[in-house]
Design a protein with these regions (language model features):
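Alpha-helical sensor/transducer elements of the RecA-like P-loop NTPase core
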Residues: 6, 10, 26-27, 52-56, ...
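Conserved catalytic network of the ASCE P-loop NTPase/AAA+ motor domain
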Residues: 33, 121-125, 151-152
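Hydrophobic anchor at the beta1->P-loop junction of P-loop NTPases
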Residues: 42
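P-loop (Walker A) phosphate-binding loop of NTP-binding proteins
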Residues: 45
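Conserved phosphate-binding/catalytic loops and adjacent sensor/switch elements of nucleotide-binding enzymes
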Residues: 48, 52-129, 138-140
Length: 152
């Protein structure tokens, strides 16, 4: 994988939630139910608190959470995959070891190979992990969409 200083670490951290937030138990319950399935989409206009809601809502279930805050710069599939691996390694450093080696061996590691390695590592880890792709609306590259579809 790239040197640690080439990744923006704050993109890999779940946002801090304040204690004085408005309680939204019904929405938090829906998020908790959504963790039982392979995919949960949360949509609303900009500024409606989606990130805050998810950050507050997924802290309770006890499931490890890998967080990746996306932006327009993450439309290159290689960059997206590097950040994806790093986000999962924040949860469990053993996940993505082979994928990191693939990046070191080749700057153009095939997405399917990297993702297959990640899926296998997640299976070996033996526990469910939630992955939050925050601000996914910035992703417009079909190759990144296909990578996410493969992962799901």
């Amino acid at each position: 994988m790239q040197k640690a200083d080439t990744l923006i670490h704050t993109k890999l951290r779940q946002p801090f939630t304040r204690q004085e937030l408005v309680s939204r138990p019904r929405l938090h319950e829906q998020i908790a139910r959504g963790l039982c399935g392979p995919l949960t989409l949360i949509t609303a206009p900009a500024g409606f608190g989606k990130t805050t809601l998810v950050a507050a809502g997924i802290t309770g279930p006890g499931m490890p959470v890998a967080w990746l805050s996306l932006d327009r710069n993450d439309n290159q599939v290689e960059r997206f995959l590097r950040y994806l691996v790093a986000a999962l390694q924040e949860v469990d450093h053993t996940i993505g070891s082979e994928a990191s080696q693939l990046f070191l061996a080749s700057q153009q590691a095939p997405a399917e190979t990297v993702l297959t390695s990640l899926i296998n590592d997640l299976d070996i880890a033996g526990r469910e992990t939630a992955l939050v792709l925050d601000d996914y609306q910035f992703i417009s590259n079909q190759a990144v969409h296909e990578a996410v579809a493969f992962l799901i």
